[in-house]
């Protein structure tokens, strides 16, 4: 039983750490100028924490099978309180992560539009001082045969 309580405590602590990371991610995404390196670091942190959560949840389910118990653990008040916190945190994290996904989608769309504008201006045809068409500073000569 002590191992189960320890696993549940670690699960709650890991979810709290994930909450901080996801909130930091949201701050970066809302800042207007997204720092790609910082976002990459956060993605790595999230992946690591989610792998830990998955491992701890598997341990929890194994303990449940062995001890013939199941969530919400109403017969064990200490564990029931931790389970309630796990449910609340996962609900909150899911909502924030969904919102961050929308923010990230908007940032990707913005970057895609900016790249399209930049690429279009590079292929735009102009006339040089000699009257010939130029493409981004290169003279294009038409030869008739």
What label would you give each PLM region?
Residues 2-69, 73, 81:
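Extended, charge-rich alpha-helical scaffolding segments
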Residues 79-145:
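Short terminal interaction segments
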């Amino acid at each position: 039983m002590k191992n189960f309580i320890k696993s549940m405590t670690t699960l709650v602590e890991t979810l709290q750490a994930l909450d901080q990371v996801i909130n930091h991610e949201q701050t970066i995404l809302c800042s207007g100028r997204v720092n790609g390196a910082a976002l990459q670091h956060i993605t790595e942190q999230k992946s690591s924490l989610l792998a830990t959560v998955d491992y701890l949840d598997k341990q929890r389910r194994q303990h449940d099978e062995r001890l013939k118990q199941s969530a919400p653990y109403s017969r064990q008040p200490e564990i029931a309180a931790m389970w309630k916190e796990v449910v609340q945190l996962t609900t909150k994290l899911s909502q924030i992560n969904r919102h961050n996904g929308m923010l990230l989608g908007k940032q990707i769309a913005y970057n895609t539009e900016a790249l399209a504008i930049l690429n279009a201006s590079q292929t735009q045809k102009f006339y040089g001082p000699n009257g010939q068409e130029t493409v981004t500073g290169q003279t294009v000569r038409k030869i008739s045969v």
